Regions:
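Phosphate/NTP-binding elements of NTP-utilizing enzymes
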Residues: 1-207
Length: 207
């Protein structure tokens, strides 16, 4: 299903209310679906949607322990962010997404699910949770870890230390030669060392 078109359809039917700026952005994106400059592929977004809804669970009350079922707008933004590609190069059109959401509307939970999807679906990448302060950067990092621990399938393949979340268990002596080397780390403006990261996904909060 094309969730971008379905989202626009629900807005036009009056079932969903959006602001003027978002409405204009959606109109442009819908027109770009037929623009020969771009190719739209639903599969990359669908892959991440399937991962989140299969393996991720809520960790906060009142939904603690319940499966994370994405809303229509969340599915739409994942398809758009990963689905639009340049027709000539096949590179992704969008490398940055600005997400403006009011407090207590699930922003951290949503981003944590995306980070876990990238962690498991990519290889050898650094996923960084960043903010102005270490305390703020730690909020997303801990939500990712809580979501990881809530899933037996994810937890048994990974571990956490004071520096990062990584593949492999602490007491497992099995060779890491063929193991996924991806890591999830946290970083703030207060961090002394900001170099040496191969950042595939950078989530910047409260900037």
């Amino acid at each position: 299903m094309n969730y971008l078109l379905e989202y626009c359809k629900q807005i036009e039917a009056g079932n969903i209310v959006v602001g003027k700026e978002l409405g204009s952005t959606l109109t442009k994106l819908r027109l770009d679906l037929t623009n020969p400059k771009y190719h739209y592929d639903e599969k990359p977004g669908d892959l991440r949607i399937e991962f989140i809804e299969t393996f991720c669970k809520h960790t906060k009350s009142p939904f603690n322990g319940m499966p994370f079922k994405l809303t229509l707008w969340e599915k739409a933004i994942l398809q758009v962010a990963y689905g639009f590609k340049m027709s000539d190069s096949k590179f992704r059109r969008f490398n940055e997404v600005v997400l403006l959401i009011a407090r207590k509307n699930g922003k951290t939970t949503f981003v944590a699910g995306i980070d876990l999807a990238e962690f498991f679906l990519s290889k050898g990448v650094d996923i960084v949770c960043a903010s102005n302060t270490s305390e703020q950067a730690n909020i997303l990092f801990e939500e990712i870890n809580n979501m990881r621990e809530a899933s037996k399938a994810l937890e048994k393949r990974t571990s956490k230390n004071i520096f990062c979340i990584k593949f492999g268990k602490k007491n497992n002596n099995k060779s890491r030669h063929n193991m996924n080397k991806s890591k999830i780390k946290k970083m703030s403006a207060q961090s002394k060392n900001k170099d040496g990261y191969n950042i595939e996904v950078g989530c910047i909060d409260e900037v």
